[in-house]
Amino acid sequence: MTSALIWMASPPEVHSALLSSGPGPGPVLAAATGWSSLGREYAAVAEELGALLAAVQAGVWQGPSAESFAAACLPYLSWLTQASADCAAAAARLEAVTAAYAAALVAMPTLAELAANHATHGAMVATNFFGINTIPIAVNEADYVRMWLQAATTMATYQAVADSAVRSIPDSVPPPRILKSNAQSQHSSSNNSGGADPVDDFIAEILKIITGGRVIWDPEAGTVNGLPYDAYTNPGTLMWWIARSLELLQDFQEFAKLLFTNPVKAFQFLVDLILFDWPTHMLQLATWLAENPQLLVAALTPAISGLGAVSGLAGLTGLVPQPPVVPAPAPDAVVPTVLPLAGTATPTTAPASAPAAGAAPGPPAGTATATSASVPTSAGGFPPYLVGSGPGIDFDAGTPAGSRRAQPAADNVTAVAAAQVSARHQARRRRRAAAKERGNADEFVDMDSGPAIPPSGERDAWASNSGVGGLGFAGTASNETVAAPAGLTTLADDEFQCGPRMPMLPGAWDLGTWDRGD
C-alpha cells in the first residue's frame, strides 16, 4: 500500500520516461542465462561424480577404502546437486523479473499517448467558445486521470513482482570439504576444544545477515565461504581482512583456553603464531603495499601530519629574544644661516649713555663688539633691520665708520661658527660609524649645511652703535649737544605695500659730528 502511494505521487510522464529509457531487460536476461549455464555445469559434475563413486564401490577398489572415499565425497555430491537446483531457481526468478518488466512496459502509457492527451486538451480549451467543449474537456481530463492511475498501478505491480522474485532466490551455500570422517572429527576438536562456541555461532549469524549471505563463516571447520583462512592471500580484497579478523579471534580464544588448562602448550601455540603465522600475513600486506604505493602514502599522511603538529609545540619551550632596538640619533639643532647681530644680543657691559667726565675711558670699540657678539641668544630682541627688505645695494656707503671698524670681530664670529658646525658634522659621522648596521639602513636628512661664509671682502653682519657711548681721546669731555640714537622706528606701509627705504633719523642728528666723536 505504501509503495502504491509513492508511485501515485508522480505524474505518468515520469514513470513512462524512466521505464522506457532504462537499460531494459537485457542485463537481467544475461544474468538468468548465466545462472542456467552454471546450474547445468553443477548437474554435469554431480552426474560425473556419482558415476565415479558407483564405479569405485563396484570395481577393483571395493572394500573399506572405497567405502571411506564414497562417504567423504557424498557431502560434496549432495552440495553439487543442491547448487545445480539453486542455480536453476535463480535463473527462473530472474526470468520472472524480465517478464514483469515486459508486462509493465506494455501496460505503461507511452509518452506519445500522454503528449497526444495534452495536445488535445490544449486545443479544446483554446476553442471552448461559449462552453461548447466543456464535456469533451472533462472526458479528456478523466482519460488523463486514468493514465495516471494506470501508470502508478503498473509500477507498484512491477515492484512487487520483482522484489518477491529476487528475495526468493536461494542463497549459495559453500561447498563442504572432502575429508575422512575421523579426520573431520579431529579437526573440529582441535579447533573448538570440545564443541562449538556460542559466541562464534552468534558472530557467524551476524555476518551472514549483514552481508546478505555473502560471507558464510564456519567456526567449527575454520573456513570462510568454504575456504580455509590461509586461502585468502590478497590484502586488496575485503575477504582477506575478514578472514584475518576471524582467524585472530579464534587464535586468541584458543590461547585463552590453553592458558588456563596447559600454560606450556599455550606458550608453544603463541610462539608458533609469532614465528610462522603472523609473519606470513605481514609479508602479504607488505607486498601489496609495495605494489600500491599510493595507498601507503594515503595511510601515512595523517600520521606525518600528527608528528608535524607535535613538533610545532617545541616553539612553546621558549620564545626567541628579539634584537635590541637601537634608538635613532636625535637630529642636530638647526643652525641659522645668518648669525644674529651684536645689536640683537643682550648687552652686559656697555651703558646706553655716554660716561661722565673724568671717568675711566671705555674699552675699544672692537673689544666691546666682540664681547657682546660671543654670547648669542636663541631669541633676539628684534630683527637687525625693521625697515623694508633690509639694506640695499648702497648700504655700505651709508654705514658709519665705527661699524666698519667692527669687521674683524664679525669675521672671528663667522670662523667660530664654522668651526662649531664642522665639529658637529664630525660627531655625527662618528655616531653613524659606531651605529650597528641593520637590514634596514637609516638615512638622515641633513637640512643645515652651516652658515654661509661670505667671500673675502664682503660683509653680511654689522656691529651696532647702541650702547657704545661717546668715543674720543681719554680725558676729554664729550659734546652733549647731540642726542644719541635711541632705536629704529618702522613706518606703516602704504596701500601698495611700499614703505620707506631709508631709516628715520633724528632731525638734530648730525651724522658727520657723530662719526667724528665730537
From Swiss-Prot:
Q: Where does this chain mainly localize?
A: secreted
Write the record's keywords in alphabetical order, separated by commas: Cell wall, Secreted, Virulence
Could you tell me the superkingdom of the organism this chain comes from? Bacteria
One of this protein's Pfam families, by short name? PPE-PPW
Q: Where is the composition biased (Low complexity)?
A: 181-196
Provide the residue span(s) of the region labelled Disordered.
Answer: 177-197, 346-375, 435-458
Q: Name one GO biological process term.
A: response to host immune response
Places the protein is found? Secreted, Cell wall
Q: Which GO terms describe its cellular component?
A: cytosol; extracellular region
Please give the function described in this protein's UniProt entry: May play an important role in the persistence of mycobacteria in host cells. May regulate the innate immune response of macrophages by promoting the production of pro-inflammatory cytokines and inhibiting the production of anti-inflammatory cytokines. Promotes the death of macrophages during infection.
Which family is annotated?
Belongs to the mycobacterial PPE family.
What PANTHER family does this protein's entry cite? Answer: GLUTAMINE-RICH PROTEIN 2
**Other known facts:** Expression in M.smegmatis enhances the ability to resist in vitro stress and early survival in macrophages. Macrophages infected with recombinant M.smegmatis produce significantly greater amounts of interleukin (IL)-1beta, IL-6, tumor necrosis factor (TNF)-alpha and an early decrease in IL-10 along with higher levels of host cell death.
Full protein name? PPE family protein PPE11
> Which organism's genome codes for this protein?
Mycobacterium tuberculosis (strain ATCC 25618 / H37Rv)
